[in-house]
Amino acid sequence: MNDTEFHQLVDAQMQIIEESIDDSGADIDYEVSGNVMTLEFEDRSQIIINRQEPMHEIWLASKSGGFHFKLVEDKWTCSKTGMELFEMVKQECEKHAGEEIDWA
């Protein structure tokens, strides 16, 4: 994939994350600045999601540590855990929020 395709795919993934947070009704603030999305929780803890263009990866940093995601068979997959990005975002949001979130 070239850089343009990478950015289009990451933009689509970030949009899914934003819409899911909005639809969940959870008390999560998010801000996108350049290549970085910051999710902030009531206790002021944060999850940082950013795109790494040179490696065509998405990186996620949270209380649980740092994770790198590569596009594998049309899914952003963690090189450490094998978990899909959106599943990791949901799991980490619930850890940071300290409660289950309705992602319906």
Curated annotation (Swiss-Prot):
Protein name: Iron-sulfur cluster assembly protein CyaY
CDD domains: Frataxin
UniProt KW keywords: Iron, Metal-binding
UniProt-listed InterPro entries: CyaY, Frataxin/CyaY, Frataxin/CyaY_sf, Frataxin_CS
GO molecular function, one term: ferrous iron binding
Any GO CC annotation of this UniProt entry: cytosol
Provenance organism: Vibrio parahaemolyticus serotype O3:K6 (strain RIMD 2210633)
One Pfam family from the record: Frataxin_Cyay
Domain of life: Bacteria
Record family assignment: Belongs to the frataxin family.
Function of the protein: Involved in iron-sulfur (Fe-S) cluster assembly. May act as a regulator of Fe-S biogenesis.
Family annotation (SMART domains): Frataxin_Cyay (SM01219)
Any GO BP annotation: iron-sulfur cluster assembly
